[in-house]
């Protein structure tokens, strides 16, 4: 399990085409990717399971906890990205709810675009 940031501070100012915004690149892949939105409600749980392939979880709203061993949990909040390798066991839970985007693909390299979270 690795942690990354995709918050505003890790982005780049874009001014092309008279634009004025900050964009944080997240991932690029040449292989098929599955992208979904997860809505965990109050006391929501994504049960302990093995990642079927590389998986990137992007926290958009709310807070939660992630674990790879069901003993030590790490807090996640908006702007955090969590990466699990294929076959890595993990669990995600939230006391008050969270919304996240999940990206699954055989070809994920989040460190190519996002800084590691320290």
Annotate each PLM feature.
Residues 70-86:
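Short acidic-glycine-tyrosine-enriched beta hairpin
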């Amino acid at each position: 399990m690795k942690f990354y940031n995709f918050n505003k501070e890790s982005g780049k100012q874009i001014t092309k085409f008279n634009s004025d915004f900050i964009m944080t690149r997240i991932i690029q892949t040449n292989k098929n990717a599955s992208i979904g939105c997860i809505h965990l409600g109050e006391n929501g749980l994504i049960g302990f399971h093995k990642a079927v392939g590389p998986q990137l979880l992007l926290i958009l709203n709310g807070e939660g906890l992630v674990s790879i061993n069901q003993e030590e949990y790490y807090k996640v909040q908006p702007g955090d990205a969590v990466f699990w390798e294929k076959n890595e066991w993990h669990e995600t839970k939230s006391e008050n709810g969270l919304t996240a985007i999940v990206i699954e693909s055989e070809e994920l390299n989040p460190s190519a675009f996002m800084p590691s979270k320290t």
